[in-house]
Amino acid sequence: MKSENQTPPSFMEWQELTSLVGSIRTRSLVARPTTVEQCREALAYCRQHDMTICARGAGRGYGELALNNGQALLDMSAMNRIIAFDEEAAQITVEAGMRLIDIYQAVHHRLLTLPASPTESHSSVAGAICANVNGKDAWHHGSFARQVVRLTLLLADGETLAIDRSHELFKAVVGGIGLLGIILEATLQLKPIPSPFVEINRLPAPDVDALLATMAQVEKSHDAAVVWVDAYARGRKTGRSVIHAARWIERDDTESQRREILAAGYE
């Protein structure tokens, strides 16, 4: 472990961290920059003191990749602002630490959303890009990479690199777990939705044949789905499941749905 006696910049301090499920505990020098210049300063400090540094978003990954015991972490969660929003082009440019749920809250009332919506809505944009995550609507929209229009990458030497989908490094950065550099910002393509509300249907399946048949229908009739499988079922009950399927509600239905939601005590 590197010495903790060497004074780092004011936005860097040694902290204990745990993995998402609490199974791993580490101690790292955590930098929480609010500007690109502070990101550069953190990288420079690590170069000067022979330390490795790992980018960290919201810490919501199950793979526990954003832990760097005894070394440095660049926590991008404070860089979470909307840089630009082009409603006509349906594109939004955000900083790396912007959470997906904050994007939804910013655009849903404008009848827009992210085409590929990961299951973990509290993940950061950069984390979703680095892991190229997918969600319950992957069969329609693929993984998160498909909606990335362009991004800005901070290299280890402090230089920045603008990368769009035609750039030779694009496919290496997306899904690259941050190994090529630090994502500073990204422009994402949004898609129109009929309303900000969804209808969720709960569909039981008594066995694997029923599961496959139901999912074939759900793929045509719904926008997203998740299956909860009873792993202990055996014999004729193998594959026993519950399917949660969702579809966007058409605009004409939203007012009655809104009244039902408010009557149930939700906002």
What are these regions (language model features)?
Residues 4, 10-19:
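N-terminal regions that are enriched for targeting/export leaders
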Residues 15-23, 79-85, 186-194:
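Short, flexible, solvent-exposed loop/turn segments with mixed acidic/basic and small polar residues
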Residues 22-119, 131-137, 227:
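Glycine-rich N-terminal segment of FAD-binding domains in flavoprotein oxidoreductases
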Residues 137-141, 169-172:
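Catalytic micro-motifs at enzyme active sites that drive phosphoryl/nucleotidyl and oxygen chemistry
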Residues 130, 149-267:
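C-terminal substrate-binding/cap subdomain adjacent to the FAD-binding core in PCMH-type
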Residues 8, 108, 137-140, 159-161:
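Non-transmembrane, aqueous-exposed alpha-helical and coiled segments at domain scale
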Residues 87, 124, 155:
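Short, acidic, Ser/Thr-enriched surface-loop or helix-capping motifs
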